[in-house]
Amino acid sequence: MAAYAPSDALVYLECNNFLDIGEAIVNTTAWNEFRHLLGINDRSLPGSWLRRLITWTGLGPTPTVILARAQVAVVVLELGATEKDESLTIKPEAAILLETHTSERRIRPVVEDALRRFAAIAIQGATLQRHTVSDTEFIVWSAPDHNRQIVATISGSLVIVGNNERAVQTCLDVQRGLRPNLQGHQELQQMRATLKAEESLAFGFVSSANSGRLISAAAPLVTGTAPGDLRFDRLIAAGASKVLGSVGWSSGPANGGIEDRYLFVLTPNLVSRLRPFFKAGQQRTSVLDVVPDDVHSVTVYKFEDPFATWQAVQTGVSTQLDTLSTIVFTSVLKAGLNSYGIEDPNNFLRTVGPELITTRLRRESERSVLIGSVRDEAALRQVLFGQSTGGPKGPAVVMGIPGEETAASFVNGNVLIGPEPDLRTCLSEAQNAALQSDLKRLDEFVRDSSSAGVATATQDDDRVLNFFEALRRMNGSGTPADAEQLSRKLDSLPYSVTQTSLGEHGLERRTQSSFGQFGSLLPLLFPTR
């Protein structure tokens, strides 16, 4: 499918078999637990031998033949970022490429009917127009305010669907050989081999030329700076391109769910500098005793020496950058701790660890809580409160950090930093933990991710529910059968777990969840109105 994708595409995703994804989804634990509760019809998929027969002969209903034969790709051509009132809106220019391996005459009525139904779901009050440009017919569904579009064309066995005509025309030009394609890209081929794309359900790729652009788009979210500063964006993009190479993704079934694997390629010099400091400590993370078991998300940093790792990242990256880019990178790196009221990250990290976690107690929480074991309490009080004797005294005492919208507390050899109401919740949990000896669900998460330098657990209920809701919108299914039972089932879902480690080529991330990235992609196609 890379033969149809523009060589300069920002993001490229592909799937070579729809039905393999469908089979993986219906075999997950979450599917079998929830589909009846959510009113999803049980439509059996053809077996593997029947799929091969349909693919080879083309015998069967046309929709089934298309599903059995189709390969699909998604390309993002531009981010489409616009600034308004100090907020950044991202509206990517993108297209879906569907290679049906079936004649245009056979697929056209089926494809047009499917697109009509999709437009009716995706755009309320959509109107249809057709026009021809250079012997190519474009089918366009537009929202009443013309703010949204679905544009499609059929060229032989290839169907191209985009969110504007330019995206569709760009991909059409690639198919006709008028623009270079992505197929021969060396980084793409290397990423395919590394992530074993041929054995995966789906594969994704961002070239080194474009990874910096994506980093620069996300930087304002980390630093808290106003979006739209072109000079800042260019500095971030230029700096990122000197340390970050291509980015890849693959997906496959695993342990009753879906595992997503990501690779962020780093320069060999940076990998060798970081390797000695990215060793995961094996100690039990006692700081989890102050975290509620129903927490929305928690990230555990298990480095043997957090300060040494911080320094290694700073110096390792700085050696690859010019002076100005180094200053910008350092400010971005520090921003992660500045949000907790920590103005001096170096001295802070000298006084805490090796156990460090960040946690969001509730989904709606705007800020996280940072919790760490204390190495030098007097020095830490100096960092936080400006004097070694300052700050909260005694157990379960909370005190605001001067000049910051955050607070701190010391309990059982740990420091807690974050919004005051969240700290009081954690302190209450610490008191309960002293009376209980049960194995917490979070302890199981830490045990199962012991080899990773960074591990994150996130409640998966929202993504599972959104996936099924999107599926219901797509199929026109009924309402959930039992809301109370559904709520209980959602509460019992296992955490989505992400493990991050430093591998041979760069940063590797593995995420085990109910439906993987497919749980996020389907709601994008069938959003809530």
Regions found by a protein language model. Name each.
Residues 1-144, 188-244, 259, 263-364, ...:
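Structural boundary/hinge residues at secondary-structure and domain interfaces
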Residues 74-87, 147-156, 357-361, 404-412, ...:
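Short, surface-exposed beta-strand/loop micro-motifs that present aromatic residues
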Residues 100-105, 163-168, 374-378, 419-423, ...:
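Helix N-cap motif at beta-to-alpha junctions
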Residues 115-123, 178-182, 388-395, 434-435:
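A common structural junction motif
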Residues 132-148, 395-404:
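Short, Gly/Ser/Thr-enriched beta-strand-loop segments that form substrate-interacting elements
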Residues 147-222, 398-487:
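A conserved glycine-rich beta-strand in the N-terminal activation segment of trypsin-fold
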Residues 153-159, 257-259, 294, 365, ...:
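Short, solvent-exposed coil/turn segments at beta-strand boundaries
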Residues 281-285, 408-409, 415-416, 495-529:
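A cross-kingdom marker for long, charged
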